[in-house]
């Protein structure tokens, strides 16, 4: 879809005129509480959407203006990037190249943090979604070229740009490049490196089957109005004068999903569609104090997730790589003590809910989880290394994050699973 001439002309309006347009989207003073005014929102928005409150808009603005270091490999300097800056530069460059961006959204854990920072989950990656048309291979290549070219704008002053090529920038600053092009999924991802794990992830989406695992990570916040306000208005934001920002839940019901986030509830729709990583996210949520909704068929949910995990990651080497990467991303630094609890929880779920595996394959995965749990236990310090510590999870599946109990060293860390003599039927 090419931008129309009239659309280009509208971008060239005088700042004062555009500022007036931005002001028309300003939310007047509303409730100063942490949650959106759902009653007011329902008048003009669907159930899957809601307007953000003033405190939420402030958190969003602060998040988009917080400088994030993009660490270079080798001798390349560290780039200091504000998320709103890179969004504006990339979007403008895409439009100049004839690729129209329908909207830009904040997705995932960062969006959940903006809506309810007291969930205890925090956020790592900053997921920025550009909704656009990607109908050809050329459009995929052009988005990658645009992002790499934009990185030049963020190099520190004094750095010679003459001999820096796009390939050089990719090797220096890109953590991950992904392209998915199927009948149902057309999107690409460029993840920019950050040593602390807070990667800036630019995702260019034409279509995708599913963008969430549970209701609490289904939120997207549309950034267009806030970005336009920052560009066009010289008046600082206030409770009485700020842009109207809309949030959306891909789960379907915004109010219900927000309530799940506030009360630490695990809920989802069509669990059979959850990808393999959903099993790790589920165990992560259990360790953080989240609990399945009472009406949930927990055994069925766990069976779906276990089955999908082994479909997506059948090889033990790949399983280990995925587990280690997830633990490093979500339980690094001060959170490292929770790795043991997460692995014990994962062992329990896999032990209870895995079907469609030969007994030796199942045992192989359980042994891998046991070994990683032992490593995590040893990393907690000399006291934990002195004995193998084990405590069965309670009825709610909770395992303490730190070890302050001891048992005879001869007792195994994790209970040995019952072996199954032959192939288990898939239900």
Curated annotation (Swiss-Prot):
Q: Where is the composition biased (Acidic residues)?
A: 1-11
| Metal-binding listed as a keyword | no
Q: Which GO terms describe its molecular function?
A: poly(A) RNA polymerase activity
Q: Give its localization.
A: Cytoplasm; Nucleus
Q: Which GO terms describe its cellular component?
A: cytoplasm; nucleus
Using the UniProt annotation, give all residue ranges assigned to the region (Disordered). 1-46
Q: Which reaction does it catalyse?
A: RNA(n) + ATP = RNA(n)-3'-adenine ribonucleotide + diphosphate
**What's a single GO BP term from this record?**
negative regulation of cell population proliferation
Report biased composition (Low complexity) as residue ranges. 15-30
What EC number(s) are associated with this protein in UniProt?
2.7.7.19
Taxonomy, superkingdom: Eukaryota
UniProtKB keywords: Cytoplasm, Nucleotidyltransferase, Nucleus, Transferase
Instruction: Briefly state the protein's biological role.
Output: Catalyzes the transfer of one adenosine molecule from an ATP to an mRNA poly(A) tail bearing a 3'-OH terminal group in an ATP hydrolysis-dependent manner. May be involved in maintaining the translation efficiency of at least some genes through preventing degradation of their mRNAs. Prefers RNA molecules that are adenosine-rich close to 3'-end. In addition, may inhibit cell proliferation and cell cycle progression through ubiquitination of beta-catenin/CTNNB1.
The record's annotation in PANTHER family points to: PRION-LIKE- Q/N-RICH -DOMAIN-BEARING PROTEIN PROTEIN 44, TERMINAL NUCLEOTIDYLTRANSFERASE 5B
Family stated for the protein in its record:
Belongs to the TENT family.
State the name under which the record lists this protein.
Terminal nucleotidyltransferase 5B
Q: Which gene encodes it?
A: Tent5b
